[in-house]
């Protein structure tokens, strides 16, 4: 089993702060994208890996559908995954979740074009497939 998804970055042309209050904004998608790959492992625990880190973050999902980090907590990346599991109300085990945001960097410097939103969107699409939720694009928003 292998699930691959991607979501593009974004650049605001106008209305960035209006959008925060429910107003309208004009944005363009960018050629850079966040990529998520979910695959099977031979272990009972899961692991989260990211292009932004040189090590993995093993975790399990408890009976209350909360992530239990078995070593270090990956902070923001972990919170995006935790929110997805909470929203979908389903757990899983024995999976590797790889997040690649290397497109959003120039060398070691982040270029600032919506990588967090792209990770959220790509991860949501991947979890939708993994958990067989069959949500439409509109429902995932």
Describe the function of each predicted region.
Residues 135-141:
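Alpha/beta catalytic cores of group-transfer enzymes, especially the acyltransferase/condensing modules
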Residues 1-117, 125-135:
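ATP-binding N-lobe of GHMP and related small-molecule kinases
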């Amino acid at each position: 089993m292998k699930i691959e998804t991607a979501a593009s970055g974004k650049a605001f042309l106008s209305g960035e702060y209006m959008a925060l209050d429910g107003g309208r904004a004009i944005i363009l998608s960018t050629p850079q994208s966040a990529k998520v790959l979910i695959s099977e492992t031979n272990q009972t625990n899961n692991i989260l890996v990211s292009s932004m880190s040189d090590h993995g973050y093993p975790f399990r999902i408890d009976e209350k559908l909360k992530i239990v980090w078995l070593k270090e907590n990956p902070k923001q990346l972990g919170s995006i995954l935790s929110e997805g599991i909470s929203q979908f109300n389903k757990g899983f085990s024995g999976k590797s979740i790889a997040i690649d945001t290397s497109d959003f960097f120039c060398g070691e410097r982040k270029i600032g074009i919506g990588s967090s939103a792209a990770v959220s969107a790509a991860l949501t699409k991947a979890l939708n497939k993994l958990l067989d939720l069959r949500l439409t694009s509109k429902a995932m928003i």
